[in-house]
């Protein structure tokens, strides 16, 4: 790949540099050199247009003859067999009619016959992939084949590499475990190719989206060791993914993405047909229907099984009735795309940008989902064939579909050329001059500006057709709306204060006029210094009157204060006109922004810091009555996070961190907005914030594990998907009591036996592996990006605190808690619970926790320890501001109630087992009542006081302040809590 210095070279200079490197390549033979010199000019041209091709041939000079001579011969043969794009489109749904599959399979089968080990398999697959992709690149950059042929060849090669690897691994696993059986016949796992692979329209440098499934449960037969079908196919899937995905000295075959499978990363790698059917019937979502349109079985090992599988997927994808709900789903997906473009600033992206490849795909797929149940012609996997069918069925005019086909193929050619330059999955136009030169040479343009003009026109046409499909009407103002006229005058004219007062005399009080005028004038003065271009200035001039209009119409209290918050948001987004457009084009979004800024300075500041949150106002889900079941909330977050992360490359750590932070910010805004809109009960705010953190933690752990596994392998004692690792939540996370901005108290545990190491090329002792895993998790959580920190974390509650290991063995944890822990550490353990990890290890933790909390304790000594710790905390943490109240640390505050709950557990668990069941204060008090430790009246008063104090604490955060004002109501609550404290602890509390 070219360096920064090389980026300043022309593409011709790049080509000459590559030619000299080729001539001095260690593996170059005289025959290869002679062939290369014979084709010097054509090779130099190809090198100038693709550094991937040049570097591949330098590394493997023997590819020269196969790339240059055999490719030219092959092109002549194929031209006679494939006369037109129409024939290619007919072939696309029938693998057997594609000559490329037969050609590739024949050659790869010969290669794989000599492969004996998995390492040899990986090498053979990569060498064959590189050889054939070099041939495709050579033809493409010299324009010796059209883009339709190139797409089909790349897809056929993927099919063959996938099935070749699959069958080799299947046969070798069968030697050890036997074969899965179904009525006496060998049973296979079926590989569903999704997306462009399914449609035989694969990118040159693409990942592949797969789903694995097999017919039925059972056990293998005929091997040295029989195992369940699920185990067999899971092992097969894992080895297949590794064979394709692993990066070796020879590169990678494909990046494999399994996130489209049922339940995403949290789901099993392989599912039997019945489980697959249950999932899509009960839980399949709209976006999964879009994805399933292109699903294709890659390995047709048993036609009856494939029919069975298709009979499951077909009714989910294609409804028997006209399904116009698809358009609503498409509108939502359009908004997601627009959101992604804004957040990732993808303005030069030919796939995701407005009028990009994705919009053509959605255009075709939406009609497939609406009409496909009744029109078999619309069930094709091929986008081009689908567009033809839309015209044949009189659904879309021919001039529209022909234009879309032409424009789509133009964009695919651009995409292919971009990716063939360096074999990188990119759809973004290049910045470097040599890459721009290479691009326009292949595309046939005289200059880059001419190419950009053609590209802009192409994408504008596509975007126009897409918008016609999903357009929605917009609100407008009446010409007689006097308030709106006043708002326009206030912004557009340089009104003096007296004129401003007269203009708004019928709409605002004199006090509000006095407050609003200087704020508006100051903002207008600032705005003159903004360098936002004519379009940005025009948008701002249209938007400001709308803001004033909505603000005055809503009659908020403290109107000048709300305007100041609103203009703070506008100032933050002035340089990003897409967000100004968002507010201008969506009146409901603007109305919601005004409401939220009125009710919460914290929300206003969050939106100011992270303008991406404006996208959440497009669909204000927080306005409806919220689900309050904690398990349902968690499931909803899991599904939404899965959908969010599908848009991010698995190996892009920076985008992973940004995606998680964006997800958290958006969900946290929804919770806060629900809170202040009173659509979410106060005691459920913490529930939602807590399960949100759990879901994000699970994803972070899985991502960190994947990164560690790629580098070091996994500890050798593990089987299947086990990690031998667990995350324990303490404090507010453990007690289901997270607030806005709470940090996470975490402890990491593992259960690896002594002497175990990882099985990767770079092996580590298991303890070191788990410490590095913990460090990786902390990095993903703590790193500050443009979107802030995911969570601030605190590991000081682990055994031995900061002096202890970052990840402790479960046996060491138990020994420490039994022999060394202080009373305050056992208090902390009351609020600890298992968050995520291996089931067996989580059960071990729960057992240890119960054992420790149930120890026999002297109640008087315990009370003394608890009181001393409380006084010590108050001395260090209580605010010295006597005019305000620190709700957490004050006498009769939140922490006093928490300490009382912890004392009740530690003092009584030895005689009342149930006291260790729950980690949260409210249920601890309920349990204490059932165990007759405290009376119902006391429990009820403490619970009500706790909820009231927490409610106030949440609202202080939303008001962006730390301490509460003194009030009679607050004094009464604190006095009541203090009395219960004195009753429980007596003289030791003094």
Curated annotation (Swiss-Prot):
InterPro entries the record matches: GlnE, GlnE_rpt_dom, NT_sf, PII_UdlTrfase/GS_AdlTrfase
Region feature (Adenylyl removase): 1-474
Cofactor names: Mg(2+)
Key words, A-Z: ATP-binding, Magnesium, Multifunctional enzyme, Nucleotide-binding, Nucleotidyltransferase, Transferase
Domain of life: Bacteria
MF terms in GO: [glutamate-ammonia-ligase] adenylyltransferase activity; [glutamine synthetase]-adenylyl-L-tyrosine phosphorylase activity; ATP binding; magnesium ion binding
Family in the record: Belongs to the GlnE family.
Pfam families for this protein: GlnD_UR_UTase (PF08335), GlnE (PF03710)
EC annotation from Swiss-Prot or TrEMBL: 2.7.7.89, 2.7.7.42
PANTHER family found in the cross-reference section: BIFUNCTIONAL GLUTAMINE SYNTHETASE ADENYLYLTRANSFERASE_ADENYLYL-REMOVING ENZYME, GLUTAMINE SYNTHETASE ADENYLYLTRANSFERASE
Protein name: Bifunctional glutamine synthetase adenylyltransferase/adenylyl-removing enzyme
Catalytic activity: [glutamine synthetase]-O(4)-(5'-adenylyl)-L-tyrosine + phosphate = [glutamine synthetase]-L-tyrosine + ADP; [glutamine synthetase]-L-tyrosine + ATP = [glutamine synthetase]-O(4)-(5'-adenylyl)-L-tyrosine + diphosphate
A cellular component term, taken from the record's GO annotations: cytosol
Enzyme class: transferase
Function: Involved in the regulation of glutamine synthetase GlnA, a key enzyme in the process to assimilate ammonia. When cellular nitrogen levels are high, the C-terminal adenylyl transferase (AT) inactivates GlnA by covalent transfer of an adenylyl group from ATP to specific tyrosine residue of GlnA, thus reducing its activity. Conversely, when nitrogen levels are low, the N-terminal adenylyl removase (AR) activates GlnA by removing the adenylyl group by phosphorolysis, increasing its activity.
Underlying gene: glnE
Gene3D superfamilies assigned to the protein according to its UniProt record, in alphabetical order: 1.20.120.1510, Beta Polymerase, domain 2, Nucleotidyltransferases domain 2
Organism in which the protein naturally occurs: Alteromonas mediterranea (strain DSM 17117 / CIP 110805 / LMG 28347 / Deep ecotype)
Residue ranges, annotated region (Adenylyl transferase): 484-990
Gene Ontology biological process: regulation of glutamine family amino acid metabolic process
């Amino acid at each position: 790949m070219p360096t920064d210095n090389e980026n300043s070279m022309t593409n011709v200079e790049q080509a000459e540099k590559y030619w000299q490197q080729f001539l001095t390549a260690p593996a170059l033979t005289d025959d290869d050199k002679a062939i290369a010199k014979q084709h010097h000019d054509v090779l130099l041209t190809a090198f100038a247009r693709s550094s991937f091709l040049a570097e591949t041939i330098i590394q493997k000079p023997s590819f020269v003859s196969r790339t240059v001579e055999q490719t030219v011969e092959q092109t002549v043969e194929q031209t006679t067999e494939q006369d037109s794009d129409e024939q290619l489109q007919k072939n696309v749904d029938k693998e057997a009619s594609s000559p490329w599959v037969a050609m590739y399979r024949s050659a790869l089968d010969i290669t794989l016959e000599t492969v004996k080990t998995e390492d040899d398999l990986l090498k053979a697959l990569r060498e064959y992939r590189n050889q054939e992709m070099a041939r495709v690149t050579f033809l493409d950059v010299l324009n010796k084949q059209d883009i339709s042929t190139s797409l089909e060849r790349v897809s056929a090669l993927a099919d063959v590499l996938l099935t070749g690897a699959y069958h080799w691994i299947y046969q070798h696993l069968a030697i050890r475990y036997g074969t899965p059986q179904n009525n006496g016949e060998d049973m296979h796992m079926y590989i569903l190719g999704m997306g462009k692979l399914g449609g035989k329209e694969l990118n040159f440098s693409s990942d592949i989206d797969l789903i694995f499934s097999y017919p039925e449960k059972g056990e293998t037969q005929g091997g040295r060791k029989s195992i369940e079908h699920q185990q067999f196919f899971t092992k097969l899937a894992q080895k297949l993914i590794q064979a394709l995905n692993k990066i070796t000295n020879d590169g990678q075959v494909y990046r494999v993405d399994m996130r489209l499978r049922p339940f995403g990363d949290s789901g099993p790698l392989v599912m039997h047909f019945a489980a697959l059917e249950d999932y899509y019937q009960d839980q399949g979502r709209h976006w999964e229907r879009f994805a399933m349109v292109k699903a294709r079985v890659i390995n047709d090992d048993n036609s009856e099984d494939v029919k069975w599988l298709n009979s499951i997927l077909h009714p989910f994808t294609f409804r028997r009735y006209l399904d116009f709900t698809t358009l609503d789903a498409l509108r939502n997906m359009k908004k997601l795309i627009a959101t992604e473009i804004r957040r990732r600033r993808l303005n030069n992206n030919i796939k995701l940008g407005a009028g990009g490849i994705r919009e053509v795909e959605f255009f075709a797929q939406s009609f497939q989902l609406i009409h496909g149940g009744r029109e078999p012609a619309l069930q094709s996997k091929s986008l081009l064939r689908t567009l033809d069918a839309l015209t044949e069925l009189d659904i879309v005019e021919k001039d529209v579909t022909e234009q879309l086909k032409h424009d789509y193929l133009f964009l695919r050619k651009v995409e292919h050329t971009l990716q063939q330059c360096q074999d990188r999955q990119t759809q973004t136009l290049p910045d470097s001059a040599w890459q721009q030169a290479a691009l326009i040479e292949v595309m046939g343009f005289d200059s880059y500006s001419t190419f950009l003009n053609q590209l802009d026109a192409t994408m504008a046409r596509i975007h126009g057709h897409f918008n016609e499909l999903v357009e929605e009407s917009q609100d407008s103002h009446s010409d007689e709306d006097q308030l709106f006229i006043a708002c326009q005058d206030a912004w557009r004219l340089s009104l003096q204060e007296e004129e401003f007062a007269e203009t708004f005399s019928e709409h605002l009080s004199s006090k509000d006029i006095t407050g609003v005028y200087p704020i508006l004038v100051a903002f207008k003065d600032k705005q003159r210094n903004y360098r936002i271009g004519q379009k940005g200035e025009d948008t701002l001039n249209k938007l400001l009157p709308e803001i004033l209009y909505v603000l005055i119409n809503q009659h908020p209290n403290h109107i000048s204060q709300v305007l100041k918050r609103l203009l703070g948001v506008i100032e933050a987004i002035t340089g990003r006109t897409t967000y100004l457009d968002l507010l201008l084009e969506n009146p409901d979004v603007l109305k919601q922004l005004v409401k939220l800024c009125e009710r919460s300075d914290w929300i206003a500041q969050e939106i100011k810091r992270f303008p991406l949150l404006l996208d959440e106002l497009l669909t204000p889900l927080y306005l409806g009555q919220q689900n309050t079941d904690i398990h349902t909330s968690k499931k909803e977050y899991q599904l939404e996070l899965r959908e969010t992360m599908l848009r991010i490359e698995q190996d892009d750590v920076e985008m992973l961190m940004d995606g998680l932070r964006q997800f958290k910010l958006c969900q946290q805004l929804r919770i806060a907005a629900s809170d202040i809109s009173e659509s979410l009960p106060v005691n459920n705010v913490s529930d939602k914030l807590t399960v949100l953190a759990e879901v994000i933690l699970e994803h972070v752990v899985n991502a960190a594990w994947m990164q560690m596994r790629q580098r070091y392998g996994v500890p050798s004692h593990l089987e299947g998907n086990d990690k031998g690792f667990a995350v324990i939540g303490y404090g507010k996370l453990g007690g289901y009591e997270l607030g806005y901005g709470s940090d996470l108290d975490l402890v990491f545990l593992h259960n690896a036996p002594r002497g175990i190491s990882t099985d990767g090329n770079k092996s580590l002792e298991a303890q070191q592996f788990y410490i590095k895993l913990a460090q990786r998790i902390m990095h993903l959580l703590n790193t500050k990006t443009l979107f802030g920190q995911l969570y601030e974390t605190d590991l000081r509650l682990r055994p031995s605190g900061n002096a202890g290991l970052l990840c402790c063995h479960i046996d060491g944890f138990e020994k420490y808690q039994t022999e060394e822990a202080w009373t305050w550490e056992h208090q902390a353990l009351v609020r600890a619970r298992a968050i995520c990890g291996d089931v067996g290890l989580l059960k071990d933790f729960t057992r240890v926790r119960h054992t420790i909390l149930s120890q026999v304790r002297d109640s008087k000594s315990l009370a003394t320890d608890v009181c001393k710790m409380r006084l010590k905390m108050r001395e260090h943490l209580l605010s010295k501001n006597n005019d305000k109240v620190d709700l957490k640390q004050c006498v009769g505050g939140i922490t006093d109630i928490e300490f009382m709950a912890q004392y009740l557990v530690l003092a009584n668990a030895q005689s009342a087992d149930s006291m260790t069941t729950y980690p949260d204060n409210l249920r601890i008090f309920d349990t204490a009542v059932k165990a007759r430790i405290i009376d119902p009246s006391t429990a009820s008063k403490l619970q009500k006081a706790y909820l009231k104090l927490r409610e106030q604490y949440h609202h202080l955060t939303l008001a962006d302040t730390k301490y509460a004002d003194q009030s009679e109501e607050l004094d009464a609550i604190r006095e009541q809590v203090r009395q219960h404290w004195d009753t429980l602890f007596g003289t030791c509390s003094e």
